[in-house]
């Protein structure tokens, strides 16, 4: 039998072993073995691209995987529910009576400090949970990890419901429930990104944000339904419904496949094949499934050569992980600095300030706009790409925030804040708040989760995603805690702060964030390792699809003047 024939009869796993053995001998020269092994662990040094790609099928073929990913994404609903309900709790009479303080005349109130702590401490719990509990996904699998963090979330809800009149008990409950949501925020997008077909990955990961908006909207509606009660029904019923959402999440995990990348990492090759086959609705022995498994195994085997991943590897610039970590943390931070939670956490309070008699109703309007707009976001993320959507989102939100803040500063109180507000100015502000929410929900709401979930190599993915997501929670805490103080001091001038952040976001995306639409996770990794310039990334072609005339070096440098580079795509 010839050598070529022998290779042709090898299984994908046997072929991979042969390739790895040969490449290992090449990479083992004494002079720079350690350096090359480190690079090889992230995919450099050899190319393991699937020879046969999984074909794109009609939309009806992806109904099953879409439903499964929506079940995983339901973790976002849990987070959104908290955001939608807490904004109403802090304005409900029974909640204020139990957890607030008393003026000298006997009236109850929540101080700015206590309000800020109750609202925002949830984010600190989320940041800690994202860093600590996301490790469960590497240890026991993404599915088991999600179930465990949901149970932790339930414990936090029990503590909150059991609170009678001690605000610090409620405070502790929010920290613990935040731990669970922090783990969910890392593991849900991670699992979706690893089970979804590459041409649907952006859409399906965006379903996590869709669930967040659904939770916010229904949370607003529940607050509206309970506001007329005079007892703890006002806030205990919305909290009690959290048990239903958590149990649905746990039940849904029994129907979804485990990450094929995790299964390959722990040696469960047959299960990895089945997971890929189920997600793409093809036979387990389909050549495209075998090729996909081989590509995944190549990355896993290369990672094993370098040993266990450490936290220190997140700061490696040689393998471009540090650059990716900074970009991921910045994208997540900037999502908060858009000012979205200024509306969502304090929506009820804001619209009282513009003179509305029932600000709960206005919050519902914002919730409807937010939820409906996210469907548009799910479409545009794959139609126009991550980078383009982020740029348009930053530009359009800037315009909306300028109008919103300017009207609030110059027209809302024409005769001073001690006089009635202008109804026309208030209506104008609500309209532009809705425009702003539309622009946010279609771009910066879902896309940061997509970008972060597909940026990092498997070897350090959970660690890197937890750090990037923690940056989001940290800024969420800062905005949630300090907003009452800032708005009390400068009122609607606060909008100009977010406007400045939005301008910065536009240029940051323009110069730093690459386009990853239509690429496998392994191809995204290769693009980062090749050092492709972000403004040329849309034209980058993976090694497996390059023609003879393709110039890879052209993607890594640009001799044009800066002003031309910024708006160049080639």
From Swiss-Prot:
SUPFAM superfamilies: MFS general substrate transporter (SSF103473). It is a multi-pass membrane protein. The keyword Membrane applies. The chain crosses the membrane at residues 61-81, 117-137, 144-164, 175-195, 202-222, 237-257, 341-357, 364-381, 389-409, 432-452, 470-490, 492-512. Residues 82-116, 165-174, 223-236, 358-363, 410-431, 491 are extracellular. One of its GO terms (molecular function) is carbohydrate:proton symporter activity. It comes from the Eukaryota. Belongs to the major facilitator superfamily. Sugar transporter (TC 2.A.1.1) family. This is High-affinity hexose transporter HXT7. It comes from Saccharomyces cerevisiae (strain ATCC 204508 / S288c).
């Amino acid at each position: 039998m010839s050598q070529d024939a022998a290779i042709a009869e090898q299984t994908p796993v046997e072929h991979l072993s042969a390739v790895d053995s040969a490449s290992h001998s090449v990479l083992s020269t004494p002079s720079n073995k350690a350096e090359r092994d480190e690079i090889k662990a992230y995919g450099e040094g050899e190319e393991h691209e699937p020879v046969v790609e999984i074909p794109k099928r009609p939309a009806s073929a992806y109904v099953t995987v879409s439903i499964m990913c929506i079940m995983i994404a339901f973790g976002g609903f849990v987070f959104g529910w908290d955001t939608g309900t807490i904004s109403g709790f802090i304005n409900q009479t029974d909640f204020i009576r139990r957890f607030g303080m008393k003026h000298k005349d006997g009236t109850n109130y929540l101080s700015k400090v206590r309000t800020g702590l109750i609202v925002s401490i949830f984010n600190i719990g989320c940041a800690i949970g994202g860093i600590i509990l996301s490790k469960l996904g590497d240890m026991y699998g993404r599915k088991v990890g999600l179930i465990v963090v949901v149970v932790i979330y339930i414990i936090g809800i029990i503590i909150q419901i059991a609170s009678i009149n001690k605000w610090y008990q409620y405070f502790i409950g929010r920290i613990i429930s935040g731990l669970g949501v922090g783990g969910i925020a890392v593991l849900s997008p991670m699992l979706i990104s690893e089970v979804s077909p590459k041409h649907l990955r952006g859409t399906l990961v965006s379903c996590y944000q869709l669930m967040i908006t659904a939770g916010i909207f229904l949370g607003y509606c529940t607050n509206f339904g309970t506001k007329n009660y005079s007892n703890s029904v006002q806030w205990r019923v919305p909290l009690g419904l959290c048990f239903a959402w958590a149990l649905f999440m746990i039940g849904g995990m029994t129907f979804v496949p485990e990450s094929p990348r995790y299964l390959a990492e722990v040696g469960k090759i047959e299960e990895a094949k089945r997971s890929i086959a189920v997600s793409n609705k093809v036979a387990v022995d389909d050549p495209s499934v075998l090729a996909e498994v081989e590509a995944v195994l190549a990355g896993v085997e290369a990672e094993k050569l370098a040993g266990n991943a450490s936290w220190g590897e997140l700061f490696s610039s040689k393998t471009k992980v540090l650059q990716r970590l900074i970009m991921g943390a910045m994208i997540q931070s900037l999502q908060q600095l858009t000012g979205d939670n200024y509306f969502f956490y304090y929506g009820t309070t804001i619209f009282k300030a513009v003179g509305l008699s029932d600000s709960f109703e206005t919050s519902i309007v914002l919730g409807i706009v937010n939820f409906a707009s996210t469907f548009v976001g799910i479409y545009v993320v794959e139609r126009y790409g991550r980078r383009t959507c982020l740029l348009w989102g930053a530009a359009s939100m800037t315009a909306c925030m300028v109008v919103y803040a300017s009207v609030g500063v110059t027209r809302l109180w024409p005769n001073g804040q001690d006089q009635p507000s202008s109804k026309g100015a208030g209506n104008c502000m609500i309209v532009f708040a809705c425009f702003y929410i539309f622009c946010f929900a279609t771009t910066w709401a879902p896309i940061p989760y997509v970008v972060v979930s597909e940026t990092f190599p498997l070897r350090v993915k959970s660690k890197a995603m937890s750090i990037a997501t923690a940056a989001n929670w940290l800024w969420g805490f800062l905005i949630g805690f300090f907003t009452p103080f800032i708005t009390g001091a400068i009122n609607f001038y606060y909008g100009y702060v977010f406007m400045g952040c939005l301008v910065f976001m536009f240029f940051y995306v323009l110069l730093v964030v690459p386009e990853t639409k239509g690429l496998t996770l392994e191809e995204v990794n290769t693009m980062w390792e090749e050092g492709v310039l972000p403004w040329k990334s849309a034209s980058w072609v993976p090694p497996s699809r390059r023609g003879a005339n393709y110039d890879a070096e052209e993607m890594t440098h640009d001799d044009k003047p800066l002003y031309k580079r910024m708006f160049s795509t080639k």
